[in-house]
Amino acid sequence: MAAKIKSGDLVKVIRGKDRGKEGTVKQVLKDDRLIVEGVQIVKKHVRATQQGQQAGIVAVEAPIHRSNVMVIDPETKQPTRVRIVEKEEARDGKVKTVRVRVAKKSGKELA
């Protein structure tokens, strides 16, 4: 199955303690979790390393499950579901079928 949420997408949190916050996806993990910029901030205790990093408490983004976020439609600026549409394109003199992500509310292609 093609990925409906990719890194770089603008998403809105729809469930959890950060409900309503928006951010861009920094990383997509294999277990259906995402790291979203500015969302799900937790404090992590870090040891000092020999390379000069100091010990202390650091705020980092924790993963959030993909079912708790929705992609923001670039045209309407509202959360929307994503469809996968197959369309044919001519490349190098051949017609190839390409899968494209499309916002369900506006029908526009997602980058």
UniProtKB/Swiss-Prot annotation:
InterPro entries assigned: KOW, Rib_uL2_dom2, Ribosomal_uL24, Ribosomal_uL24_CS, Ribosomal_uL24_KOW, Translation_prot_SH3-like_sf
GO biological process annotation, one example: translation
GO function terms (MF aspect): rRNA binding; structural constituent of ribosome
Keywords noted in UniProt: Ribonucleoprotein, Ribosomal protein, RNA-binding, rRNA-binding
One Pfam family cited in the UniProt record for this chain: KOW
PROSITE patterns hit by this protein: RIBOSOMAL_L24 (PS01108)
Origin superkingdom: Bacteria
A cellular-component GO term for this protein: ribosome
Record-linked NCBIfam families: rplX_bact
Family classification: Belongs to the universal ribosomal protein uL24 family.
Function of the molecule: One of two assembly initiator proteins, it binds directly to the 5'-end of the 23S rRNA, where it nucleates assembly of the 50S subunit. One of the proteins that surrounds the polypeptide exit tunnel on the outside of the subunit.
Assembly and oligomerization: Part of the 50S ribosomal subunit.
Protein name: Large ribosomal subunit protein uL24
Organism of origin: Bifidobacterium adolescentis (strain ATCC 15703 / DSM 20083 / NCTC 11814 / E194a)
Gene name of the encoded protein: rplX
